[in-house]
């Protein structure tokens, strides 16, 4: 018989930097989860993604056990890293802060495809290119 789910917690945590301080500790403590056990497991699982904020979905069961799923870093983080910028622009129509090649966009699509709401790489490339444009990053050939 399946365990009874009592809650689902969605967080974005820097890879390998989960610790009991806010926001992780209070969010998990409210559901009665062993915070240190989660932190150790999360840090171990994300050791190869250093430098990114990792979305994580934690499912908490009635017996206070948990499972978690890590997703790929947000598209904006991948775009910023590929374009070599620290942040996007506040006015993407006037200010361009960086450039991405189509090859870089396809590289981001390969990483992000499992989290996007499409299975078509061309459509996924349009989604990533749109995110880049809204940050003031040009997509060039």
UniProtKB/Swiss-Prot annotation:
Note the coiled coil stretches, chain numbering: none
Assigned protein family:
Belongs to the universal ribosomal protein uL11 family.
Q: How does it assemble?
A: Part of the ribosomal stalk of the 50S ribosomal subunit. Interacts with L10 and the large rRNA to form the base of the stalk. L10 forms an elongated spine to which L12 dimers bind in a sequential fashion forming a multimeric L10(L12)X complex.
Matching Gene3D superfamilies: Ribosomal protein L11, C-terminal domain, Ribosomal protein L11/L12, N-terminal domain
Q: Does the keyword Ribonucleoprotein apply?
A: yes
Does the keyword NAD feature in the UniProt annotation?
A: no
**What is the name listed in the Swiss-Prot or TrEMBL entry for this protein?**
Large ribosomal subunit protein uL11
Under InterPro entries, the record lists: Ribosomal_uL11, Ribosomal_uL11_bac-typ, Ribosomal_uL11_C, Ribosomal_uL11_C_sf, Ribosomal_uL11_CS, Ribosomal_uL11_N, Ribosomal_uL11_N_sf
Maturation and modification: One or more lysine residues are methylated.
Question: Which SUPFAM superfamilies does the entry link to?
Answer: Ribosomal L11/L12e N-terminal domain, Ribosomal protein L11, C-terminal domain
Provide this UniProt record's keywords sorted from A to Z.
Answer: Methylation, Ribonucleoprotein, Ribosomal protein, RNA-binding, rRNA-binding
Which Gene Ontology terms cover its molecular function?
large ribosomal subunit rRNA binding; structural constituent of ribosome
Cellular component terms, GO, for this chain's entry? cytosolic large ribosomal subunit
Q: Which GO terms describe its biological process?
A: translation
Q: Please name the Pfam families in this protein's record.
A: Ribosomal_L11, Ribosomal_L11_N
- Function, in words: Forms part of the ribosomal stalk which helps the ribosome interact with GTP-bound translation factors.
